[in-house]
Each structure stands twice: as structure tokens, then as C-alpha cells.
Amino acid sequence: MEIAVFGGGAWGRALAFAFGEKNEVKIISRRDLNEPLKKLNGALISKGSAPIEQVDLQRGLKAALYVIAISVQHLREWFQNASLPKNAKVLIASKGIEVLNRAFVSEIAKDFIDPNSLCFLAGPSFAAEIIQGLPCALVIHSNNQALALEFANKTPSFIRAYAQQDIIGGEIAGAYKNVIAIAGGVCDGLKLGNSAKASLLSRGLVEMQRFGAFFGGKTETFLGLSGAGDLFLTANSILSRNYRVGLGLAQNKPLEVVLEELGEVAEGVKTTNAIVEIARKYGIYTPIASELALLLKGKSVLESMNDLIRRA
């Protein structure tokens, strides 16, 4: 079966590599895919088990299944320009919350695609590990379990993909963990110790679940791969862009400098502000996200982390 992957960043390339084990894959991107990405340590998707052909949008639209790995902040504009069929079978691999409209990914997507044709990828994984064929377990959330299983069956032998519902829980967990991961990077960068880090992540998980429950997310989603699994991975590894943002902030570098040095999108930065605004609107208690938002706006990193630990 032919699968089109939209997005030529690290995540898009890794997913193209993964789906290429069992399927014919086309990748659609403005980037030159012959140019190695630092995020992937120079690995090219052409080294995968099957050749990945880069094609234009119109050719990509002829595929049977679509995988979308576009930055959340550009996702709405991308949908507007791509003009996918309303009944297209879509797996969205983007994680975050749209700042402009404070919208969840599913809210953006349903404006363009039949909700019964939408799936959302969640769970702990790094592009740099997937492109090496290292094993992981992921979750495909969808109201259409048959479609979720169809996508799951297309994943490679080194990925165990589970089909679940609870779209809102899965996407909030995937977005919120990036916020906590920044705080985790700050904690490690300041060398506050394992006890402080454990407290931060434990309370961060509770905060994620509280926020998600307000919108109907299920507790078991936050305790599983989509929530705790993704959080513990992202908040503890140098492979995480959001974690590296925290490390940079811990060195008292201005956010602009940290992001410039990163050279990649760290969704957690903008997601933090979106979460705080949503929480303020609905009266949801989000102490870690709220304190992190102040840090991102220039508050002293030591003062911010001390306040965060005391409040968390």
C-alpha cells in the first residue's frame, strides 16, 4: 500500500523510514531530503529498508494513507493549502497546541477532514532512534478503531502500535509533556538532584491529568504510553528538543539564543503559553506550566525553579 508522509523534518523522515519497511512511501517536503539533519545525526531516509521517493503535493495526494508531521503552529495553514480530500485517511503525528486560536490538534484537523477519518499518533519515541530501527511502543488514538488498526498494521516490526480511543487525552498528554520536559531540563541543568526531579515529574503528571480531565481525557491515558511514557522519555533525555531548551535556560541564556542554537522547533515553548491561557480561561490549576511561562518571559531561572518546586 502507498503511504504519503507530509513533512521533511526529523519526525517526518523517521516516520517515512518506519512505514517504508512494509509499504511504498512517498514523502512531500519543501526541504532537500539529501541534506542530513543534525537531529538525525546525519542519517538519511534513503538508507532505509525501502527507497523513499520525494514527490510533489499532487502526486502525494494519490496515496491511500496520509501521515502528517507538520509543526502544530503551521498545521492549519498547511491544511488550507494542501486541500486534502474530506474523507482522506489521516494519521497526524504532530504534538502541541495552536497558540493563535488556542486550539487542540483535533480541533484544527476536523475543520478539514471527516473526524471519522482521523487518527493521532502518541507515545514515547525519538526520531533519531526510530531511524535506527530501535524498538518502541506507540499509540494511535481514533474514534474509528478500524482505521487506527489499519495504520497500526502498517507500522514496522520494531514498533508495537496500540489502537485506542480518547483522542483528547492522547493529544493533551503529547502536548503537555513538552512543557514539563522543559522544566525537567532546567532542573537537571541546575543540578537540583534526583529527588527534586522526581517531585517535578510526578507533580507534572498530575498537572497534565488534571488539565486533560477537564476536557474529557481519561486517567488511564495519562498513566499509559501517551502520558507517563512520553513524559518520562522526553523530560530525561538530551535527544529531546524541549529538554535541551530547559538545559539552555538553566545556563541563563536568553530564550532567543537557546532556540537559535537549537535550530529546530521545540513545540513546548509555544504550547506553554497556550496552556496557561486556556487554564486561565477555564480556571484550571496549572502551577508548573504557569511558572514556566514566567521563566520563558525572562524571570530568573533560579527564582523560577525554586518557586516551581515549592508550588508543585
From Swiss-Prot:
Where does this chain mainly localize? Answer: cytoplasm
| Catalysed conversion reaction | sn-glycerol 3-phosphate + NAD(+) = dihydroxyacetone phosphate + NADH + H(+); sn-glycerol 3-phosphate + NADP(+) = dihydroxyacetone phosphate + NADPH + H(+)
Q: What is its EC number?
A: 1.1.1.94
Catalytic residues of the enzyme: K177
Q: Which residues bind sn-glycerol 3-phosphate?
A: K95, G123, S125, K177, D230, S240, R241, N242
Instruction: Give any GO molecular function from the UniProt entry.
Output: NAD binding
Its function?
Catalyzes the reduction of the glycolytic intermediate dihydroxyacetone phosphate (DHAP) to sn-glycerol 3-phosphate (G3P), the key precursor for phospholipid synthesis.
Name by which UniProt lists this protein:
Glycerol-3-phosphate dehydrogenase [NAD(P)+]
